[in-house]
Amino acid sequence: MENKVKFRDLLSEGQIFAPCVYDCLSARAADLCGYKALMLSGGAVSYSMDGLPDMGFSTIDEVVWITERITNVNPWPLIVDADDGFGESPVVVYRNMHRLVKAGAMGITIDDSTGIRGAERFFYALAKGEKITISEAMKVVPRDLWLTKVKATLAACEGTDCVTIARVGVPLNNQESFIEAMERAVRAKELGAEMIMLNVHNLEDARRVAKYVKGWKMWPDVTSKDGVPDVNLDDVYELGFNFVTMHIFEKAAMYGMMKYGLENFKNQNAVYSEMHDMGGYATFKQQMMTLVDHEKWIDLEADFKNL
C-alpha cells in the first residue's frame, strides 16, 4: 500500500501501543480499533497458518507471504517477528531480511535464540509441574554469532523505512545473565540497531535495563494478573520503552468462534450468530465493511467496465 505511515516517524512522536496480528482480518480489526502499528507475531502465525505451536515450524516463505498480504491492504506499519533470521549464516539472514523489507515490513526483530523456540517448552513444563528455569528453556546462541545476524539485518534495512530491533533473549533472572544481556544490547546498539528488545516483565526489570540501555526499547507483550496490568504504559515510556505490544486478537477470535459455534451447535440452527452483529455495527453494509472495503473494489470494477 502506497503512502503508508512510517514506523520511525511514529516512534519519534511518542509511545506506540500495538496488538499482535497474524492475518489480514486481524490487521483489519486493529485498524478499526484505532491502533497505529501492528506486530506480526511469530507464534500467532504458526498457530493460524500451520496449526502448530511456536516451536520453530514457520518458514521464511510463510512469513514473507503473510507480511506482503497484510502490508498490501493495511495502512499502518507492520513490525515482523523474524525469530533467529531463519538461518545460521549471516548472508542467509541478510537475504531473508531483505525479502521481508521488500514485502513491506517497517520493523524487524532479530533474536539470539538457537532456532529451537523455548517459550512453548517452558510453559508446558511448568504446566506438568516440572522444575525448569527459563534459562534452561530459552537457550541462546553465542553473542558474536547473534551480532553477525544483527549486522546482516541492519544491512538489509539500510536506506529503507525498516527499523532493526535487536532482540536479546538472555534472561534477566540472575546477575550473570543480566550482565550478558546488557553486553549484547550495548553491542547491538553500537552496530547501529535503533531499538532493543529484552525479556522485561515488570517495572523493576525496566528500571535496571534503562540504566544500561539508552534510546528506543521494545516491551514485548504486556499482560495482567488478577485484573491488574503488569505495568503502566506511562511508567515504562519514561524509561525509553516507546514500542509496546500485546496478544489479543488470536484470543478474541478463538473466543468468538467457540462462543458462536457452541451456541449454534447446541441450538442446531444459526439464530444465535445471526442475532449478534459483526463488530458492533447494525447494518449489513457496516458489517461487511468490517471485513474488507467492498465498495472500493466493486466501484473500481464498475469503472473498468465503463468503456
Predicted regions located by residue number:
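Alpha/beta enzyme core
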Residues: 2-246, 297-307
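Extended, intrinsically disordered, low-complexity segments
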Residues: 7, 249-307
